[in-house]
A protein has these predicted regions:
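Walker B catalytic acidic pair
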Residues: 159
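Active-site-proximal or metal-binding-adjacent scaffold patches in catalytic folds
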Residues: 1-154, 163-206
Length: 206
């Protein structure tokens, strides 16, 4: 649809509006309703072309910096934001370390927030840093092991807030802010680091 940019198209009856996303791997995805005419989709892409090219360029520059930083971390890993020798750890080891931390912190923070959860798990290839199911089952991404403990605690608070508010309403964010006043800075920090952490973990054996 755009001559110089490959685009993956996802069509579904569940999709209600046209949207354009760029994944961390720089894949451009156009989501469109089944009923959307091709001409409308093409016009939408033309409208978004300038933004798309500018954003892709910025992300490519960011990736270039990322690769240069990864070179300085060859055979290194971060454990709670501390540099360690990657050869001393497997993914299983890191999972146990993060799980132990969560087993200690989750009940403490849940008690402070006057809420509860039914179960929690740590996932190796999670697409999100954390999630909370309708039945209050919590899930956390293994890559959080690389982050500072304060940032991990923010994710814990974020997911526990979902046991109270099943959305991202003003009440939800008010709840998060009550227990994590600097959540915005921590959220932005994690957003900037997530790809870096993911790449760091790729050098480890299961």
């Amino acid at each position: 649809m755009l001559d110089d940019i490959p685009i993956t198209i996802q069509k579904s009856k569940k999709i209600k509006t046209l949207s354009l996303n760029i994944t961390p791997s720089l894949e451009v995805i156009l989501k469109m309703p089944d009923s959307c005419p091709q001409a409308r989709a093409s016009a939408f892409l033309k409208e978004q072309e300038a933004w798309l090219k500018k954003t892709l360029l910025a992300m490519q520059e960011k990736y270039s910096l990322l690769h240069s930083r990864l070179n300085t971390y060859k055979d290194k890993i971060l454990v709670f934001d501390e540099v360690k020798n990657a050869n001393d750890y497997t993914l299983t080891d890191l999972k146990k370390i993060l799980k132990t931390y969560l087993e200690r912190k989750l009940p403490l923070i849940a008690q402070k927030m006057q809420t509860s959860y039914t179960h929690f798990s740590v996932r190796n290839n999670a697409k999100v840093l954390g999630s909370c199911s309708y039945h209050n089952r919590l899930s956390f991404a293994l890559l959080l092991i690389c982050a500072q403990k304060e940032a991990i605690d923010y994710v814990i608070i974020h997911e526990l807030a979902h046991t109270i508010h099943k959305n991202h309403s003003q009440n939800f964010w008010r709840c998060v802010k009550t227990f994590c006043p600097n959540y915005r800075a921590l959220r932005e920090h994690l957003k900037q680091k997530v790809v870096f952490y993911t790449q760091l973990l790729k050098q480890l054996q299961p």
